[in-house]
């Protein structure tokens, strides 16, 4: 039986630009910055159990925590460490950065494997290897898991090249942790797992060993490097699976897309499946399994970090809104820079994430602090998703909705 719900959402703003040339230049600058960057990691252990809040511009600890982990051992050897360098950034660059004082303060908000053994709690960022701590997380605890594992690709890391595994080896690697993650999901829970064209078939085979695959979402990245002897890779897949196909939550009404209608169709002079407004004609459309409205974070967006494979908040917002309800628990065993945790917090869900790289955990912690003051999600406003380059339409829509609510309250 499907559970349905309706929720109102706070005002948000969209960070997309309508000028393609500016967006292209932004992407080029970010790529240049990333190519010059050496990733960093810290040392030391956090105390765990901290709430992500900001008070009087200072980070305070009030009782929660959260993180994520797991790394493919063959591709990233343990003896390779990450380092950071200071960058000169443009004045409008909003990429998340850390001062030394922030590193020290945020580090106290991050849990580790030892603090997890002392007791699990919701809203933790755990700086640890997933395989070393996953058994300390309770079974059947999470309503939804979002997984963005290492893809089976050739990589250059700190100047060293690592080769991809065979499909059989990669599937063995997936089984090594996927079965354990499945145990953490409730009997009526759901899962989304990301992959690219090369590893998506392996992911499907392993997922189907434990869960029922319901669909495959393909989303378009406007980024991607060109290739001389192959097609440019600008698409990624997200597999949607559930434990029980007869009992899971999916709320399509929470992920509707508002699109402008360029050629409206009328029946006897009345709008057909669209709304006529002073600002134009719009239609509420059901989401398909192909998404071309997602912007990959770049330097002028508040959510942007230096993580090389950061997922957009808008992308995860669709997954979380469709397959969970406020108060539900979200697990991300490969947290990265914290997108799943941040979006879960903005949408009033609990989270737990594991990440092996301390630098990424610190970025996630800062983003969680910022989410207290800014709950906006690019491309999502007042319970509605918007297509690319529709910032003006979205702002008008939100403003009129707000004015309408004020009039009703005054009556």
Regions of interest found by a model, annotated:
Residues 114-133, 371-399:
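S-adenosyl-L-methionine
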Residues 23-24, 37, 43, 69:
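Intrinsic disorder/low-complexity segments
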Residues 2-12, 17, 27, 31-32, ...:
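Core catalytic lobe of class I
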Residues 355, 367-370:
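Catalytic-site neighborhood detector that most strongly recognizes the C-terminal catalytic loop/helix
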């Amino acid at each position: 039986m499907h559970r349905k719900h309706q929720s109102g959402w706070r005002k948000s703003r969209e960070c997309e630009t309508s000028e393609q040339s500016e967006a292209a230049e932004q992407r080029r600058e970010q790529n240049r910055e990333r190519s010059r960057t050496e990733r960093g990691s810290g040392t030391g252990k956090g105390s765990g159990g901290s709430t992500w809040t900001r008070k009087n511009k200072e980070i305070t600890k009030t009782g929660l925590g959260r993180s994520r982990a797991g790394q493919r051992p063959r591709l990233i050897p343990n003896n390779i460490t990450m380092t950071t360098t200071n960058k000169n950034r443009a004045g409008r660059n909003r990429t998340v950065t850390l001062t030394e004082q922030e590193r020290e303060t945020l580090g106290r908000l991050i849990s580790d494997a030892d603090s997890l053994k002392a007791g699990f709690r919701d809203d933790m960022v755990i700086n640890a290897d997933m395989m070393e701590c996953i058994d300390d997380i309770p079974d059947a605890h999470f309503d939804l898991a979002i997984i963005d594992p290492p893809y089976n690709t050739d990589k250059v890391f700190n100047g060293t090249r690592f080769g991809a595994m065979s499909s059989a080896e990669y599937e063995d690697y997936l089984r090594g942790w996927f079965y354990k993650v499945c145990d953490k999901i409730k009997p009526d829970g759901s899962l989304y797992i990301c992959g690219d064209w090369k590893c998506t078939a392996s992911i499907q085979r392993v997922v189907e060993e434990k869960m029922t695959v319901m669909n495959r979402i393909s989303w378009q990245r406007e980024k991607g490097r060109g290739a001389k002897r192959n097609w440019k890779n600008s698409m990624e897949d997200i597999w949607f699976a559930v434990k029980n196909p007869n009992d899971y939550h999916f709320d399509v009404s929470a992920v509707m897309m508002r699109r402008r209608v360029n050629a409206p169709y009328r029946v006897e002079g009345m709008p057909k499946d669209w709304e006529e407004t002073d600002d134009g004609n719009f239609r509420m459309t059901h989401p398909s399994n192909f998404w071309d409205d997602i912007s990959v974070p770049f330097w002028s967006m508040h959510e942007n970090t230096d993580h090389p494979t950061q997922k957009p908040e808008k992308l995860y917002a669709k997954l979380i809104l469709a397959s969970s309800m406020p108060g539900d628990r979200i697990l991300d065993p490969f947290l990265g820079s914290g997108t799943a945790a941040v979006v879960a917090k903005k949408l009033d869900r609990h989270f737990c994430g594991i990440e092996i790289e301390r630098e990424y955990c610190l970025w996630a912690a800062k983003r969680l602090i910022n989410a207290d003051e800014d709950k906006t999600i690019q491309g999502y406003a007042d319970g509605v998703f918007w297509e690319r380059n529709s910032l003006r339409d979205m702002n008008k829509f939100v403003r009129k909705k707000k004015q309408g609510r004020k009039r009703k309250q005054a009556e």
